[in-house]
Amino acid sequence: MSWITPDLIEILLSILKAVVILLVVVTCGAFMSFGERRLLGLFQNRYGPNRVGWGGSLQLVADMIKMFFKEDWIPKFSDRVIFTLAPMIAFTSLLLSFAIVPVSPNWVVADLNIGILFFLMMAGLAVYAVLFAGWSSNNKYSLLGAMRASAQTVSYEVFLGLSLMGVVAQAGSFNMTDIVNNQAHLWNVIPQFFGFVTFAIAGVAVCHRHPFDQPEAEQELADGYHIEYSGMKFGLFFVGEYIGIVTVSALMVTLFFGGWHGPFLPPFVWFALKTAFFMMMFILIRASLPRPRYDQVMSFGWKVCLPLTLINLLVTAAVILWQAQ
């Protein structure tokens, strides 16, 4: 058939890759909630969810059915349009953040030359969703949680971006595939160890995960900026948070641990194993660390993370200039 051209086939294959990768990310984010509950139960010497399916394997399905049939309630004096848009923006921005991550040499949704900048833009867009949710709910606890979340996210995004500049300087590109190819013989975590440490800390803070979950502190804010959400609107926030964890874990692998590079096994298997390891670390951090005060979180960011990030960037620049001579 004459209308089937090589360009059309390439477009269809690109769409297929995008759909497959994004569906896998959503599925991983959803199943991570079950894995987290089981592991936290193990660490806290209790069973965790184990009633639905073999070993609790169908607990996620039960939770989805329950959430689907929950009342989609909107507060009486809220801004209905913004209240509805907020979870959509949060979910979409976090899902699109994964689009620039190369899973294997030929599997990436969007191989952009400004890949890292695109991730930072999507992370910044998620802040608006939190602000919209807190302000439109017409609830003081929601607003306080949104203010905390926006201040924390904007602050730690500074360190998040600066911690990546050393990697960009070494690779000479913002393209994620170029950065992975630059690690064929030496992973970036060795020359950029302090950059990795600050990126990991900032990544946990941007995802609002324990111990940086002050915007959702149950003891203080009764669940923070999404206290008024129920049904599938809350589900979008809930799954979006875990998609953020998957994305940050995948970025740690891509930027600092060689991406898909590894011996014997296929590239996507290495990428999946490394990403699963860092997803597990998010759960271990939640199980083992206490929650500090909000002022301690902000003070730690500006007084510890920022100087460490700047020193790492200056040392990296000096080494690159010395090697160029």
Swiss-Prot record:
Q: What is this protein called?
A: NADH-quinone oxidoreductase subunit H
- Quaternary data: NDH-1 is composed of 13 different subunits. Subunits NuoA, H, J, K, L, M, N constitute the membrane sector of the complex.
InterPro entries in the record = NADH_UbQ_OxRdtase_su1/FPO, NADH_UbQ_OxRdtase_su1_CS
Q: Which domain of life is it from?
A: Bacteria
Q: Which HAMAP family match?
A: NDH1_NuoH (MF_01350)
- EC numbers, comma separated: 7.1.1.-
Molecular functions (GO terms): oxidoreductase activity, acting on NAD(P)H, quinone or similar compound as acceptor; quinone binding
Q: Main subcellular localization, coarse class?
A: membrane
Report the function annotation for this chain.
Answer: NDH-1 shuttles electrons from NADH, via FMN and iron-sulfur (Fe-S) centers, to quinones in the respiratory chain. The immediate electron acceptor for the enzyme in this species is believed to be ubiquinone. Couples the redox reaction to proton translocation (for every two electrons transferred, four hydrogen ions are translocated across the cytoplasmic membrane), and thus conserves the redox energy in a proton gradient. This subunit may bind ubiquinone.
EC top class named in words: translocase
PANTHER family recorded for this chain?
Answer: NADH DEHYDROGENASE SUBUNIT 1, NADH-UBIQUINONE OXIDOREDUCTASE CHAIN 1
Membrane-crossing residue ranges in chain numbering: 11-31, 50-69, 81-101, 114-134, 154-174, 186-206, 237-257, 265-285, 304-324
> Upper taxonomic classification of the species?
Bacteria, Pseudomonadati, Pseudomonadota, Gammaproteobacteria, Enterobacterales
Q: State its location(s).
A: Cell inner membrane
